[in-house]
Amino acid sequence: MHFLSEDLEDYVAAHSQAEPELLAQLNKETYQKVLLPRMLSGHFQGRVLSMLSKLIRPSSILEIGTYTGYATLCLCEGMQENGIVHTIDIKEELVDFQRKYFDKSPWSNQITQHLGDALEIIPTLNKKYDLVFIDADKENYINYFEMIVPKMNKGGIILSDNVLWSGKVLEPLQKNDLSTKILLEYNQLLNNDPRVETVLLPIRDGLTVSRVL
């Protein structure tokens, strides 16, 4: 869900940095060939991710939920020259699609793809991170956060996507709606956890920026 009108979204995009050509191609092919293309970050949120990365200047990035690799490439734009990205996704059918676009980018040799369950993969990554982007199964957001915090460098940034969940965070909770229940708990955790300071941005479907203290 987007919380701005279509006209306002168009205005915002028109007055933000243009979408790079490679990402425009990736965007188009995702909508043509991949299921659930609305999961793609898209032009405006992609530019936000790029800007945040450029402000942070990370040398190490972890992404949980690659999808077709759009956000991955946005985050790479601010990465230090010798930086690395580890990106995790569970969908085998997307691996070649991701790699095709990674190989067209300047960061082909700096992006490591991991296929499988992030809860199993994260503990095997012996690395400290400057920037983490969580955009995977909502039921595990809290589990991901708890795994990630000890792996963060001081001052590192954790980005969490879809935290407004199409506005469901304000609606009466349905009995079997585990995703919304966990997101409500997650948003509360980020707001109260003394290990981080957090701001929730109403960008697209909600994007939280948490700085590790």
Per-segment meaning from a language model:
Residues 26:
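Beta-strand-loop-alpha "switch" segments that mediate conformational coupling across diverse proteins
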Residues 19-23, 179:
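Generic alpha-helical segment signature
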Residues 8, 22, 45-48:
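Short N-terminal amphipathic alpha-helix/helix-capping patch enriched in small hydrophobics
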Residues 43-213:
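S-adenosylmethionine/decaboxylated-SAM
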Residues 38-40:
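N-terminal small-domain helix-loop-helix segment of the aminotransferase-like
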Residues 35-36, 59:
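Short, contiguous, well-ordered secondary-structure segments
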